[in-house]
């Protein structure tokens, strides 16, 4: 057998094979021998069918079996002999199989790029300065007030406004005819929530209990019910009740309702502390992302499409899971699988490049994850999730893949810490990034 390896690019190799005619003949005889054991031809017992009839009826199956046997035997041996580590399935191209002649085929595969990281000290990156934002604290207190609010019936002369909860009956018509799902009684709607057709809530504003009115709207072109999309509609509405939201007063008693606080100042201090923690985590995450991007800019290289596709599929599945937790779907976000992959392909490529660079740098600088590092991380995970340390530790001991993933993440974190220690970091306002 003769083998020749072509480097088509830094990430793609083509292995050319030539199988001697003697080997081909041997495999053909072997294949017909196996076929004869099971061949059923009228007038002959199994195992007794003459070869000329086998050739006549089973030549295609013979060729398939021979190709499979030859390729399985020679392809994997060549990978080992030539030290080729593919990241993709092979693309096989072959000549027609002919008895008495040598057989040629090729296998094209993608391989990991040979990454040697350079210019990784002194990377220049910008870090956002943490700035305390009083408005964020006020907004959080407002949210807490909203969560502690209760509804009270409005007086008879109250005109509905955004934020009110209005109960009403409605009947909808398109072209003068009622439509499915276009009518309801005692329907409650928070004005300004945007839950209804655009323009509907705006026309409820200003109405009072007992008012009857006619509301005209146009269904959006992308409305879920295709038979209504883009059509004008008229709704007859009757206002039955208006409730206004009563917010608790912001004082020490309000703070005490949350259990651990004795005063409003203590509550504000806690909100500030949590906000600072979240903001600094965000700033640190974005700094690390910019650092990796700077490393990629200094060390650009080709990435196998297979690795990008794998990362894209992982990102897609994670996105679907996050949306499902919010009872949402990709379609609700205006995306399908293909559209998502087109939109986020460059992101996936950057993530793959970053991972390969960090892995290569870990080898170059002999950065390893010690048992103490892993133990400390497992303790951190247990504390964050309020779980027993033994439970979390057992999970990782019994799940090799989860432990491997955690170790890989820890190694990446250590490499990024190494880079940060040698980087030139410029703290700037957010507007300068």
From Swiss-Prot:
Listed EC numbers: 5.2.1.8
SUPFAM superfamilies: FKBP-like, Triger factor/SurA peptide-binding domain-like, Trigger factor ribosome-binding domain
Gene: tig
Main localization of the protein described in the UniProt heading: cytoplasm
Keyword Cytoplasm: yes
Name of the top EC class for this enzyme: isomerase
Catalysed reactions listed for this entry: [protein]-peptidylproline (omega=180) = [protein]-peptidylproline (omega=0)
Residues in PPIase FKBP-type domain copies: 163-248
One GO process term, biological-process aspect: 'de novo' cotranslational protein folding
Lineage of source species: Bacteria, Pseudomonadati, Thermodesulfobacteriota, Desulfuromonadia, Geobacterales
Protein name, entry field: Trigger factor
Localization per Swiss-Prot or TrEMBL: Cytoplasm
Pfam families the record matches: FKBP_C, Trigger_C, Trigger_N
Protein task: Involved in protein export. Acts as a chaperone by maintaining the newly synthesized protein in an open conformation. Functions as a peptidyl-prolyl cis-trans isomerase.
An example molecular function term from Gene Ontology annotations: peptidyl-prolyl cis-trans isomerase activity
GO cellular component: cytoplasm
Domain commentary: Consists of 3 domains; the N-terminus binds the ribosome, the middle domain has PPIase activity, while the C-terminus has intrinsic chaperone activity on its own.
Listed HAMAP family: Trigger_factor_Tig
Keyword field contains Cell division: yes
Keyword terms, alphabetized: Cell cycle, Cell division, Chaperone, Cytoplasm, Isomerase, Rotamase
């Amino acid at each position: 057998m003769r083998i020749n390896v072509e480097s088509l690019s830094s990430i793609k190799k083509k292995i050319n094979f030539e199988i001697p005619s003697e080997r081909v003949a041997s495999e053909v005889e072997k294949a017909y021998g196996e076929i004869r054991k099971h061949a059923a031809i009228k007038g002959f017992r199994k195992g007794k069918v003459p070869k000329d009839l086998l050739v006549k009826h089973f030549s295609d199956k013979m060729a398939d079996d021979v190709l499979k046997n030859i390729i399985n035997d020679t392809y994997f041996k060549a990978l080992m002999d030539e030290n080729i580590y593919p990241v993709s399935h092979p693309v096989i191209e072959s000549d027609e199989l002919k008895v008495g002649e040598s057989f040629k085929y090729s296998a094209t595969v993608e391989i990991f790029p040979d990454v040697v990281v350079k210019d990784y000290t002194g990377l220049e990156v910008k870090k956002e300065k943490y700035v305390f934002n009083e408005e964020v604290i006020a907004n959080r207190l407002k949210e807490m007030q909203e969560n502690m609010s209760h509804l009270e019936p409005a007086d008879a002369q109250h005109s509905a406004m955004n934020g009110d909860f209005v109960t009403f009956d409605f009947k909808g018509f398109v072209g003068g005819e009622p439509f499915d799902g276009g009518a309801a009684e005692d329907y409650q709607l928070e004005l300004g929530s945007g839950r209804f057709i655009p323009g509907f809530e705006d026309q409820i504003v200003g109405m009072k209990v007992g008012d009857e009115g006619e509301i005209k709207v146009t269904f959006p072109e992308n409305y879920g019910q295709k038979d209504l999309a883009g059509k004008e509609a008229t709704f007859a509405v009757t206002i039955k009740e208006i409730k206004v939201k009563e917010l608790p007063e912001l004082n020490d008693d309000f703070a005490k309702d949350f259990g651990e606080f004795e005063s409003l100042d203590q509550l504000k201090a806690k909100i500030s502390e949590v906000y600072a923690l979240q903001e600094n985590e965000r700033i640190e995450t974005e700094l690390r992302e910019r650092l990796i991007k700077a490393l990629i800019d200094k060390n650009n290289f080709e990435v196998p499409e297979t690795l990008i596709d794998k990362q894209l599929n992982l990102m897609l599945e994670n996105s679907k899971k996050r949306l499902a937790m919010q009872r949402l779907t990709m379609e609700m976000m205006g995306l399908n699988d293909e559209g998502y992959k087109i939109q986020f392909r460059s992101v996936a490529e950057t993530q793959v490049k970053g991972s390969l660079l960090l892995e290569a740098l870990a080898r170059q600088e002999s950065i390893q994850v010690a048992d103490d590092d892993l133990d400390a991380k497992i303790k951190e995970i247990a504390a964050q999730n309020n779980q027993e340390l033994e439970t979390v530790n057992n999970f990782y001991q019994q799940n090799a893949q989860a432990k491997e993933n955690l170790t890989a993440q820890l190694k990446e974190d250590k490499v990024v810490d190494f880079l940060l220690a040698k980087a030139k970091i410029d703290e700037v306002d957010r507007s300068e990034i």
